[in-house]
């Protein structure tokens, strides 16, 4: 935003004619103000990233100048000629209105000239050394100022006690939790340009890669990656069905001239994809909240319907800085499982919050991930409902079989839409957290979006709403699993592998020669008929090469069939989960025993078909 200050003996203006971008209801069409500070303002395109912070930062600048000049009358005058890269009209009006409101709250007499009108004005500058000044407010500086306003306190909850983090010997904490604490305190170790392990793995395993012809942070998924994503998506949707959640689909783009949409976007405070369509400022959603809340506002609800859950697998977008985009950890386009729960009151919300936090822990175990946890809350909520933290810690101990510390961030007052939230993070191979699931108690959106329910007396009330992603984005899930398997290999010497139910290929049949190919095909067809993702290595390659290739692809079960196996009617199966680099775990079993084992490891999980040729002689390699 560009600001031009004129300390004036007199300022008068008259709005004479509308332009096509004029605000519909101008605050005032003409005015004459004496002894005032005139603020000519141009809201710029970059300000659309965080209009709220820009408005607040601009008001700070105005207060600084007004204080020095001892001016208590302010004229806010939209003046597009101060900049070339102007914000959309909707955002500009939003910022100017917010500035007007903030100045009035701080005791100033404010006159705001209408936006988008041709106006005549007369100005008499006082002419002293400070009577003409200018300022530039940038989004970066505005966001930094916003963050500095409310300082949070960090504590560690362990052994039933809350201990200020500065009183804790970090060297005695578990390594992954220590990395989490240092990250939250801004003290994480330097990793330079070192690439996370999963970036190489996602390419090697033909899962996905960045698409060079697209915007940064947008990826293309290869057939194996598509299978993994579908398994994860169906897994979460099945969980939601078990919870009784209604599945919905909503648009990806929203109009920022809608007050509720704009205000909720401001609360997010991070970078957003914004698009202009004529004079309209539109935003690509960064989560499913916008569509979910608009849908709920049009839903007739009573107390007996609550708690009500609605779920969407949302394609979402965040305009991350290009230098911050890393592998699958931070993207500009991602797929987020989003659950929203409408609750009658805070008691019901807390009950649901704990149940959903437990669900996140259970999901992590299904994915082979153990999380470190940050509980974020206001002082008031922690004081009144400390049992929420205690029950969360108990749930972690039950899930992991041992007590784990919890990092607690306490805000002196609420600055977001949530009263409390819990974030679950997996620590990657470089010691950095990958934030995955989250549960939040939202105390603002019910009122903001006009969502109501009829209580037992028939009175309309605004609900408390929970936000929950039981996995985090599908991309980050895959990122965490790959990082976890790399750590498993580096720290324990165990071979990396995906859970069997997620593996693109669950079993591979390898005939040792042409003589046994027919028998190998029978085993292959039987496993395929049972619904498993199985392929047949029918290439004209040495057996050793075939086995090595299966290992490089992390195939959980490799079945080698030779003449001896055909004679005995058994299978020689290499079990990757139980193997190390030094020693392969091979077991002789019947086909029925292998089927039983695969059934156990995939029970209750999605059965997604293989979408590439199931004979390796016909399969291309995807990726660069």
Swiss-Prot record:
Localization per record: Cytoplasm
NCBIfam families: PRK03991.1, thrS
Keyword Lipoprotein assigned: no
Chain residue ranges for the region called Editing domain: 1-143
Alphabetized PROSITE patterns for the sequence: AA_TRNA_LIGASE_II (PS50862)
Annotated gene: thrS
Location of region: Catalytic: 197-499
HAMAP family with a match to the protein in the record: Thr_tRNA_synth
UniProt-recorded Gene Ontology molecular function terms: ATP binding; threonine-tRNA ligase activity; tRNA binding; zinc ion binding
Official protein name in the record: Threonine--tRNA ligase
Predominant subcellular localization, coarse grouping: cytoplasm
Function description: Catalyzes the attachment of threonine to tRNA(Thr) in a two-step reaction: L-threonine is first activated by ATP to form Thr-AMP and then transferred to the acceptor end of tRNA(Thr). Also edits incorrectly charged L-seryl-tRNA(Thr).
UniProt keyword list: Aminoacyl-tRNA synthetase, ATP-binding, Cytoplasm, Ligase, Metal-binding, Nucleotide-binding, Protein biosynthesis, RNA-binding, tRNA-binding, Zinc
Subunit structure: Homodimer.
Organism (species): Methanopyrus kandleri (strain AV19 / DSM 6324 / JCM 9639 / NBRC 100938)
Co-factor requirement: Zn(2+)
Family, similarity comment: Belongs to the class-II aminoacyl-tRNA synthetase family.
């Amino acid at each position: 935003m560009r600001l031009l200050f004129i300390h004036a003996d007199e300022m008068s203006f008259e709005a004479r004619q509308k332009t096509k971008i004029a605000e519909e209801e101008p605050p005032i069409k003409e005015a004459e103000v004496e002894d005032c500070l005139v603020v000519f303002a141009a809201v710029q395109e970059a300000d659309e990233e965080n209009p709220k912070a820009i408005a607040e930062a601009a008001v700070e600048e105005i207060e600084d100048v007004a204080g020095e000049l001892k001016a208590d009358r302010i004229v806010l005058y939209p003046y597009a000629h101060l900049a070339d890269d102007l914000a959309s009209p909707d955002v500009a009006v939003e910022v100017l209105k917010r500035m007007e409101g903030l100045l009035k709250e701080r005791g100033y007499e404010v006159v705001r000239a209408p936006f988008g009108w041709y106006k005549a004005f007369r100005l008499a500058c006082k002419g002293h050394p400070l009577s003409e000044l200018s300022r530039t407010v940038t989004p970066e500086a505005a966001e930094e100022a916003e963050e500095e306003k409310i300082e949070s306190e960090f504590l560690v909850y362990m052994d039933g006690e809350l201990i200020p983090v500065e009183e804790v010997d970090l060297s005695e904490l578990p390594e992954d939790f220590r990395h989490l604490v240092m990250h939250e305190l801004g003290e994480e170790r330097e990793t330079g340009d070192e690439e996370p392990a999963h970036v190489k793995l996602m390419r090697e395993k033909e899962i996905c890669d960045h698409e060079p012809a697209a915007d940064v942070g947008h990826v293309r998924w290869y057939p194996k990656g598509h299978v993994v994503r579908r398994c994860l998506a169906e897994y979460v949707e099945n969980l939601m069905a078990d919870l009784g959640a209604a599945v919905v689909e909503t648009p990806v783009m929203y109009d920022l001239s809608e007050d509720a949409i704009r205000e909720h976007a401001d609360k997010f405070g991070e970078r957003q994809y914004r698009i202009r369509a004529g004079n309209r400022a539109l935003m690509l959603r960064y989560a499913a909240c916008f569509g979910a809340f608009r849908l709920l506002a049009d839903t007739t609800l009573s107390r007996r319907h609550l708690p009500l859950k609605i779920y969407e697998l949302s394609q979402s977008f965040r305009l991350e800085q290009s230098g911050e985009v890393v592998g699958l950890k931070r993207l500009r386009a991602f797929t987020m499982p989003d659950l929203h729960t409408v609750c009658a009151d805070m008691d019901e919300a807390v009950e649901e919050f704990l149940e959903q936090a437990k669900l996140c822990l259970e999901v992590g175990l299904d994915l082979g991930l153990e999380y470190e946890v940050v509980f974020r809350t206001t002082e008031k909520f922690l004081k009144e409902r400390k049992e929420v933290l205690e029950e969360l810690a108990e749930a972690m101990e039950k899930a992991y079989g041992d007590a784990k510390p919890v990092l607690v961030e306490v805000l002196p007052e609420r600055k977001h839409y949530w009263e409390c939230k819990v974030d679950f993070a997996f620590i990657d191979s470089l010691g950095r957290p990958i934030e995955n699931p989250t549960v939040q108690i939202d105390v603002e959106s019910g009122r903001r979006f006009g969502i109501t329910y009829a209580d037992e007396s028939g009175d309309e009330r605004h609900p408390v709403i929970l936000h929950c992603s039981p996995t985090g984005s599908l991309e980050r899930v895959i990122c965490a699993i790959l990082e976890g398997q790399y750590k498993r290999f580096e720290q324990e010497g165990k071979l990396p592998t995906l859970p069997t139910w997620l593996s693109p290929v669950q079993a591979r049949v390898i005939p040792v020669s042409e003589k046994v190919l027919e028998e190998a095909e029978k085993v292959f067809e039987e496993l395929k008929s049972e619904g498993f993702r199985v392929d047949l290595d029918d290439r004209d390659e040495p057996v050793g090469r075939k086995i090595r290739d299966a290992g490089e692809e992390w195939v959980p079960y490799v079945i080698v069939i030779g003449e001896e196996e055909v004679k005995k009617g058994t299978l020689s199966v290499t079990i990757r989960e139980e193997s190390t680099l030094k020693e392969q775990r091979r077991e002789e079993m019947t086909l029925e025993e292998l089927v039983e084992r695969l059934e156990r490891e995939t029970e209750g999980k999605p059965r997604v078909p293989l979408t590439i040729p199931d004979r390796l002689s016909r399969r291309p390699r995807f990726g660069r």
